[in-house]
Each structure stands twice: as C-alpha cells, then as structure tokens.
Swiss-Prot record:
It comes from Dehalococcoides mccartyi (strain CBDB1). Keywords: Ribonucleoprotein, Ribosomal protein, RNA-binding, rRNA-binding. This is Small ribosomal subunit protein uS3. One of its GO terms (molecular function) is structural constituent of ribosome. GO terms for cellular component: cytosolic small ribosomal subunit.
Length: 278
C-alpha cells in the first residue's frame, strides 16, 4: 500500500497539510478549482528559474492568498519588490479577484523532493550522465541531513531504444510509517530522444506528537488526592494484588485468613479434611 499511494496524500491530516485551503458550494467548486490551476500554471511559467517547490492557495470572501515556496526568493521578489507587484497585478487580471502574494523561502533545497527532482532533470537535459546526476543528488541530500532518499528515473536512459527504469537509494525511506516525514516530488526531463520521468522520495525524520508535560502544581494535587484516598480504595488494591499473584501464593494467603472471614466453600473443605484425618 505504501508503495502505491501518493506519500503526501497518504499523510494528509496526520502530519501533512493541504496545498489548497478553501470551501465552496457545488456551483462554485469547479470555478475555484480552475482558478487554482490557472494560478499555479501562470506562476510556474513566469518563474521558471526561481526554484519554486510549492504554491499554497487560501480563499476568503473576495480575497485569494497565494504563498509561493521558493529556494531563490530574490528572483521572485526582484529589485525593491518590483516583480512581486507585477505578478500580483497579473494574477488579479487573470482571475478577476484581489490577490495577496506571499513569498516563503526554503532554507535547504537539498531536502525538498521536487527541487531535487528538478536538479536531476536539468542535468539530464544538459546531457549529463543520469547515474552521475542521481548519485550527486543523493550525496548532497544526505550531507544536508536527510535520513534517507530514493530516486527513480524511467525512460530512454542513455539514449537506448528500449525504455527502462532505474532506482538508486541510500538510507531508509519508511513509506508505511505515517509519522515519517517523507517529501515526494516528480518531474520530467525533456530530451531529444524523449521524456525521462524523475521521482524523488526524501525521508527527513519522524514527526512525533508533543508530550503533555505536567506542571508541579498538578503533581502536588495528585499527591494530595492519593494521600486522602479512603480505606476502601486501599483494600480493593490489596485484593487486586492478591488476584494477580500466582496460585501457590494465593493458597498461602487463604490459609492465613481466619475461619470466620473465609467463604463457605473454603470452610466446608477444611471441615471435610479434619473428618478424614480423624
């Protein structure tokens, strides 16, 4: 299952978040979806060399917030924010709504799966040997702090007539573990002999739920409650301890109990044994 399903979609709502956050009625849903596709396509065409990894879209009443995640924010922003203003006006004319454009910088491009896939694809387009490009990408990602990485290239690798598929990996990539922070990206390298598909999985570690730390006041309150516990609770715990003990210890404990407090069956057994001895 983990090998077939999309790694990001598999973890949505657990450790991953949606790239589009909005709600629309049945009538407006198709319109909003086509607007999202237009926005993403326009941004990717406008900034081809800006190393854009992801575009997040949020919608309010008459306002659309677009967050662009990029490893080269200077190319997107331009001198004095000139290119950002141009892009915002272009997007507003495209969809006919007010657009707020946010630029988010990616600190480590080697840990972003889509950017790693793009770097491999660009090298293949420049006629670099695909094995060399894949090995360099794996080395850089592991040096940047990745726990594991897997790269898959498929197509007419090396210009051969029959298309094939080659996979390289290093470290571990636990696809079935939902708490594992696995980034996934895919792209195409356009060559003279045909397209080469590149897929990249990057394992960046586990995302664990935050443990609730008890304050000192809570600890003192619990101690006070335990100190003031009634005697009935204590006796119940003793009975539970006896039930959890092995059989021999339980029989020994029953023998120590006085005859008046023993149940009727135990008393009858004791009387039968005394009669047989006599």
């Amino acid at each position: 299952m983990g090998r077939k399903v999309h790694p990001i979609g598999f973890r949505l709502g657990i450790i991953k978040d949606w790239s589009a956050k909005w709600h629309a009625s049945d009538k407006n849903f198709a319109e909003c979806l086509t607007e999202d596709l237009k926005l993403r396509k326009a941004i990717s065409k406008k900034y081809v060399d800006a190393a854009i990894s992801q575009v997040d879209i949020e919608r309010q009443s008459n306002k659309v917030t677009v967050s662009v995640r990029t490893a080269r924010p200077g190319i997107v922003i331009g001198r004095g924010g000139q290119r950002v203003d141009e892009m915002r006006h272009f997007l507003e004319d495209l969809i006919g709504k007010k657009v707020q454009l946010n630029i988010v910088e990616i600190s480590q491009a080697e840990l972003d799966a889509f950017l790693v896939a793009r770097s491999v694809a660009e090298q293949i387009e420049r006629r670099v040997a695909y094995r060399r490009a894949m090995k360099q990408a794996i080395f850089r990602s592991m040096q940047a702090g990745a726990k594991g990485i897997k790269i898959c290239a498929s197509g007419r690798l090396g210009g051969v007539e029959i298309a094939r598929r080659e996979v390289m990996h290093e470290g571990r990539v636990p696809l079935h573990t939902l708490r594992a922070d696995i980034d996934y990206g895919c792209t195409r390298a356009h060559t003279a002999l045909g397209d080469v598909g590149i897929k990249v999985w990057v394992y960046r570690g586990d995302i664990l739920p935050e443990a609730k730390e008890k304050s000192e006041s809570e600890v003192t309150e619990m101690a006070a409650v335990m100190a003031d516990a009634p005697a009935a609770v204590v006796t119940e715990t003793k009975v539970a301890d006896i039930a959890a003990k092995p059989k021999r210890v339980v029989k020994k404990a029953e023998a120590e109990i006085p005859a008046e407090e023993k149940p009727k069956r135990v008393v009858k057994k004791a009387e039968n044994i005394t009669k047989e001895e006599e």
